Amino acid sequence: MDKMTDDELRAFREQKVTELKHRAHEVRSEQVADGAIYPRIFFCTVYYTPKESGFTAERGFDATPITAPGLHARKYPRDFLLAVKKEGFGRINEAVDSRKYIRWMGDHRYAFADAPVGRRGEVLVPRRSCAISSRNKFLRQHARLKIKSQTVNEETGSDEWFVCDTGAGVHPLQIDLYWGEDEPRGAIGRQRARPHGTWMEYAFEVEVTVER
């Protein structure tokens, strides 16, 4: 996948998601002693907390200092604020009133924050917390998941996850895994949305057990 162009990856994703949709209509969960197993109807992605330190002009980013409502006239690199808008939170170089993060509030506003948190205020735990869509018909908030996937397990080092977050752009069959704090992989195309510490973009062959 890493060698695909952005357009090729987008087409590949759409094809795979279409296959998952069909499978989700046909496959039922398997009830076992530990919980319920869903065989290959979900796909996994990663999201992260971008660090301001990675958004420099030397790396090709638009580092023009700008401010926005909620930032009390403090200025940050333009591309960093765009990344915070997409990911939800960002780690700043210098704390403001002991707060080391900013968060996207919607409606063009940001706010300073103590930590990246999930839907109900739980602090996100790297390689443990994950997000699902509010339209997911199979999983619920606060569910504990065991994800069996070579890609997920090798790239994140974890197979146990806790649902505590959501996102407007998350697909109903998507499980978005929280990577943690990191600098972006690069300034071009989809590299902007990828943490530097992993090559993972998508994992489609996943088996999910919802633990009791």
How would you describe each model-predicted region?
Residues 21-212:
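Solvent-exposed, well-ordered loop and adjacent helix/strand elements within mature globular domains
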